[in-house]
Amino acid sequence: WGLLLNQKYYKKITAKDSVRDCYFAVRGMQTQKEILTKKFQNQSNYKERLSSLLNDTSDQSIQNAGMILSKIKDNVYSFETDSGKADLVSGKVVANLQWSGDGVYSMQQVEEEGIKLRYAVPKASTNLWFDGWCMLKAGIGKDKEKQQAAQAFVNYISRPDNVVRNMYYVGYTSVISGGEDKTIYDYIKYMYGSEDKKSVDYDLNYFFQQNGDNYNYV
């Protein structure tokens, strides 16, 4: 996270014009030394403490974050929401605080020119995020037709063929698995499967489904 303040990259790095993303980056800077200590990691309530630290929105934390963000503002090329990936591809900047889909886009764009970009996650912490569709209670109310239309739309974009089209266009992996239909898995394997014969498959199913009494899953 300290990269955003590194003078070596003065005006050669961009940050997100987003309260959530930039505030978290600052919290990451402020807490990374403590989080990486064995004493912190070996606590019985590690997850609760981690969440408490990174999601701290006390007046003092916000005030401290504001001062750090002012320094970041002086060091970065810009705060952006969409132009950062183009600036990275063109070489205008050398690093960009990106969402994963923008990272995929940037890497694919320069790959054809023989240039390799890397996507990295800070060792101490990062934020977990997702985009989703919501049916607003205030918007639908008791209108059955509106509810049916909203549900039909969600069903439509959740079809495996449309999920693949969306993933191809936006560069993000969907949470939709497709059930018995393997279209989505086949696409992911085709696009992102390892080409290294020495690679090892690692089963992450435990992270996405309940295992007995273990509730530590998404």
Walk through the language-model features, giving the residues of each.
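Tryptophan-centric aromatic hotspots in well-structured domains and transmembrane helices
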Residues: 1-5, 99, 129, 172
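Extracytoplasmic ligand-binding site segments that recognize negatively charged/polar headgroups
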Residues: 1-83, 87-89
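Sec/Tat-exported extracytoplasmic proteins
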Residues: 8, 17, 30-34, 72-76, ...
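An acidic- and aromatic-residue-enriched active-site/binding cleft used to recognize and process polar
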Residues: 18, 122-124, 169
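Extracytoplasmic/secreted proteins, especially bacterial periplasmic and envelope-associated proteins
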Residues: 21-24, 60, 64-67, 71, ...
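Charged, glycine/proline-rich intrinsically disordered loops and linkers
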Residues: 33-63, 186-217
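Extracytoplasmic/periplasmic substrate-binding proteins
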Residues: 74-142
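Mature extracytoplasmic/periplasmic domains
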Residues: 135-213
